[in-house]
Curated annotation (Swiss-Prot):
One of its GO terms (cellular component) is extracellular region. It comes from Scolopendra angulata. Belongs to the scolopendra toxin 2 family. It is found in: Secreted. This is Scolopendra 4722.07 Da toxin.
Length: 15
């Protein structure tokens, strides 16, 4: 699972 969905601001904000 990609954490980008829950904390997109922390992981790049792309998702």
């Amino acid at each position: 699972a990609l954490p980008s969905f829950s904390r997109a601001d922390r992981y790049g904000x792309r998702q």
